[in-house]
UniProtKB/Swiss-Prot annotation:
EC number annotated for this UniProt entry: 6.1.1.20
Chain sites annotated for binding Mg(2+): 454, 460, 463-464
Similarity comment: family membership: Belongs to the phenylalanyl-tRNA synthetase beta subunit family. Type 1 subfamily.
Pfam families, sorted: B3_4, B5, FDX-ACB, tRNA_bind, tRNA_synthFbeta
GO biological process, one term: phenylalanyl-tRNA aminoacylation
Catalytic activity: tRNA(Phe) + L-phenylalanine + ATP = L-phenylalanyl-tRNA(Phe) + AMP + diphosphate + H(+)
Cofactor: Mg(2+)
Subunit-level organization: Tetramer of two alpha and two beta subunits.
Taxonomic lineage from the root: Bacteria, Pseudomonadati, Pseudomonadota, Alphaproteobacteria, Hyphomicrobiales
Protein name in UniProt: Phenylalanine--tRNA ligase beta subunit
Keywords: Aminoacyl-tRNA synthetase, ATP-binding, Cytoplasm, Ligase, Magnesium, Metal-binding, Nucleotide-binding, Protein biosynthesis, RNA-binding, tRNA-binding
Location of the B5 domain: 401-476
Gene responsible for this protein: pheT
Annotated ranges, domain tRNA-binding: 38-148
């Protein structure tokens, strides 16, 4: 929710500073996400170019004589292609800080001629990326005036992050009400218009719903004739621009303004484009609407719409249609203020993928008691800005909302917060927030205002009092200390799962959590797909069967990473698999796969050639590592042939304990299995049944902590350096690694080349540098800057030169 400081002060009488207001907003739960304070623009003035003469010593420069509103013109040297006599633009005088250049101007000489300022572009003021020429303003702007004041940029923009329950603060007035309750200012009285209506509108509206599906809870409308739909006033345009809305015309801007000012969404129709009367109903199969955003939406039978005799004219509560939109030719309008079912609005918006400011407010809940008043305020504003004459208001389907009452023991505050607050202060806070109360003593009946649908119980009232009184006044109370737990808390299964995770993470594998249900094709490929494991109501066809193995999910995850440029990958998961639907056929399993060259010792390229592809021995080592971690010595198990047919028959094995207990399988995957799943190799993997491992007689071994991985994608760049033969390649690696120890994840030599073309006693050493972003994705400029620093480091420490 964005608003400007002056906009807030239309509703809140206060002398508090911007910082004080922002601090108070955050303290009461309306957290300030960002403040756009462009006070740095106050030094820029509007100026007019009187003359433009070519610079005698430069082809692209001109000597400008600029009128700043002072007695004497200012001489400015300018190289903009659009600089010319008569142009009105923005001038920065000496001493002004230019944010786009990060410099403070001073008087300087350019090719021997003094310049006493600078005509600025939009980019230099950081107002847009346009830098092809200097700013051009209309000729009727006041010369010498502050550009920031003229453009409305002297008004700070505050952006708060609203939680979904605070629908009352989707308007500036609701925010002002909360601030007034803190004592930082006084809430101004809302001026209610007195409309002098002159006629009855001829348009009728009907609500066509069954009682079981009443999607419109009230519909009010007025007609205004003889309007002039010109541009909205500058003050309104400046505020809309400040919060990111594009001004369109007076009628549309008024509805947008009231939506953000008072939290009351409205819609305005061109009455001359409406055919017949309006019906509010559910959509029909095959109906479409070209909305105001230019897109065409296919409507369904669950979507609430407004229609005339020719079809749908608006998606109710979300967005109007292009056919009845208002433009400069509009002379007669219908202004609509309605109440829509919040759940219906949310469902329609999600189904259509349509987001709007109206939907944002209606699906959270608007004030039902403000429907008529909001329409009156909008009508008065239309009459004031667009002229014309207004009709009497018509209303259908509306019933006054019931006032929710909550019995509130004031002792609840102390019980929940351990704070003693005087009863009088408690009631004052509630009154300032708009709550009424009845009764005396320690228990009162509180009437909840209609704009607070989130207040449903006495705990909510305690929260309201506390956020205004000050959450910082609640003293932290430490939890009671408990005696050390002597008996084991974790079961054997839980302990083994934890130990296994540590062991596999210590071998460089990444833990994965995949779905417990997979497609029937995947299940059949791994010995599953039985009828009793099929879901009755699956999420999708690809998730219709309980998994018989962890491997299908891991293989799909590895392929997804390979498709995105990470062919070398090692994944594991510790979870359950299912042989059938009985409890004793559900097994706790540790499964893992390795892809490409992702061995235990690392993947990638080396100076003496590419690393080998993973094979059966890598899978065997991982499987045995799990057994060792769980306390079973690998020397006690037997390795035999006979792994399931999803493994390669000659490159796989079965791990047994004795002749009967099968602990797991490992091996390279069968090409036919990979082909069924549309997965490319090389790939190997294993599965160990954790619940079949005998309990150890000694404490399980410990392993290293798991890796801390960034969620951002790693970037790799190759560099080749020509260096003296006697220089050790490790020195190049060390020099490259030192360029940025935070971003550079690893440096590896993958090629060493010698040839006379490089020069006598020279060699080429190629390295791969892996960059791991931490806070944000790296831009091309970031990578280029780091590359230059890396080359500089290597050159300085080894005498090498970058090979082109």
């Amino acid at each position: 929710m964005k608003f400007t400081l002056s906009w807030l002060k239309d509703h809140l009488e206060t002398d508090a500073s911007l910082d004080e207001i922002c601090d108070k907003l955050t303290a009461i739960g309306l957290e300030v996400d960002h403040v756009d304070d462009r006070s740095y623009l106050k030094g820029f003035v509007i100026a007019k170019v009187l003359t433009a003469i070519k610079h005698p010593d430069a082809d692209k420069l001109q000597i400008l004589s600029v009128d700043t509103g002072a007695d004497k013109p200012v001489q400015v040297i300018c190289g903009a292609p659009n600089a010319r006599a008569g142009l009105v633009g923005v001038l920065a005088l000496p001493g002004t800080y230019v944010p786009g250049l990060d410099v403070t101007l001073s008087v300087g000489k350019i090719r021997g001629i003094e310049s006493f300022g600078m005509m600025c572009s939009w980019a230099e003021l950081e107002l847009s990326n346009e830098h092809d020429g200097i700013i051009e303003l209309p000729e009727d702007v006041p010369i010498g005036a502050s550009f920031a004041v003229y453009a409305g940029l002297d008004d700070p923009v505050i952006d708060i992050g609203l939680t979904p329950n605070r629908s009352d603060c989707t308007g500036v007035r609701g925010i002002a009400r909360d601030l007034a309750a803190t004592g930082i200012g006084r809430l101004k009285e809302l001026s209610l218009p007195q409309l002098g209506t002159t006629f009855e509108t001829s348009l009728d509206v009907s609500l066509d719903f069954s009682q079981s599906a009443l999607l419109c809870l009230g519909f009010a409308w007025c007609e205004v004739r003889n309007v002039q739909n010109n541009a909205s006033p500058q003050w309104m345009q400046q505020r809309l621009n400040a919060i990111g809305l594009r001004p369109i015309n007076a009628l549309v801007d008024i509805t947008n303004y009231i939506s953000f000012d008072l939290g009351r969404p409205l819609h305005v129709f061109d009455a001359d484009k409406i055919k017949g009367n309006l019906r509010v109903r559910c959509g029909r199969e095959g109906e479409q609407l070209q909305a105001l955003n230019g897109k065409v939406y296919n409507l369904g039978v669950k979507d609430c719409v407004i229609a005339d005799e020719e079809g749908v004219v608006s998606i109710a509560g979300i967005m109007g249609g292009e056919r009845t939109s208002c433009d400069e030719t509009t002379r007669r309008v219908i202004i609509e203020s309605a109440l829509w079912d919040a759940q219906s609005i949310a469902q329609t918006g999600r189904a259509l993928g349509l987001i709007s400011d109206a939907r944002y407010r209606f699906e959270r809940g608007v004030d039902p008691a403000f429907m008529e008043t909001g329409l009156e305020i909008a009508t008065e504003l239309v009459l004031r800005l667009c002229g014309g004459e207004g009709s009497k208001m018509k209303i259908v389907g509306y019933q006054q909302p019931e006032i929710r009452q909550i019995t509130f023991p004031l002792s609840e505050i102390k019980r929940l917060t351990y704070l003693e607050i005087e009863h009088e202060q408690t009631m004052t806070i509630l009154t300032q927030l708009g709550f009424d109360s009845e009764g005396q003593g320690n228990v009162v009946v509180v009437k909840v205002p209609t704009w607070r649908p989130d207040i449903v119980g006495k705990a909510d009232l305690v929260e309201e009092v506390m956020r205004i009184y000050g959450l910082d006044k609640i003293k932290p109370i430490p939890l009671e200390s408990f005696m050390e737990v002597k008996d084991p808390v974790l079961t054997v299964s839980q302990l083994r799962s934890r130990i296994t995770r540590f062991a596999l993470a210590g071998r460089g594998m990444r833990e994965t959590v995949t779905w417990s249900f997979i497609s029937e094709k995947q299940a059949l490929a791994f010995g599953g797909g039985q009828a009793q494991l099929k879901l009755v109501n699956p999420i999708s066809a690809d998730m219709s069967v309980m998994r018989p193995s962890l491997l299908p999910g891991l293989l799909v995850a590895a392929q997804r990473n390979a498709d995105r440029g990470f062919p070398d990958f090692a994944l594991f998961e510790v979870s359950n698999i299912y042989e059938d639907d009985t409890p004793d056929k559900q097994h706790r399993v540790a499964g893992g796969i390795r892809r490409g060259t992702e061995q235990f010792g690392g993947a990638g390229r080396f100076w003496n050639g590419n690393a080998r592809a993973v094979d059966v021995f890598d899978a065997k080592a991982d499987a045995l590592a799990v057994l060792e971690a769980c306390g079973l010595e690998s020397g006690k198990v037997q390795i035999e042939v006979g792994a399931p047919d999803w493994y390669h028959p000659g490159r796989s094995g079965v791990i047994k304990l004795g002749s009967k207990i099968i602990l797991g399988f490992f091996g390279v995957f069968h090409p036919a299995t990979l082909e069924k799943l549309d997965i490319s190799g090389p790939l190997c993997g294993f599965e160990i049944f954790l619940d079949r491992i005998p309990e150890p007689k000694k404490k399980a071994t410990k392993s290293r902590s798991p890796l801390k991985l960034s969620s951002l994608q790693m970037v790799r760049r190759d560099f080749a350096f020509v260096v003296d033969k006697m220089v050790d390649s490790s020195l190049i690696v060390r020099a490259a690694s030192g360029a940025d120890k935070k971003l550079i994840h690893s440096v590896q030599v993958f090629d060493v080349f010698e040839d006379l073309s490089l020069g006598e006693e020279k060699k080429s050493v190629a390295i791969e540098v892996a960059l791991q972003p931490i806070e944000r994705t790296l831009t091309d400029e970031d990578i280029e800057e780091l590359a230059l620093k890396l080359v500089e480091n290597v050159t300085r420490m080894t005498g090498a030169s970058l090979r082109c």
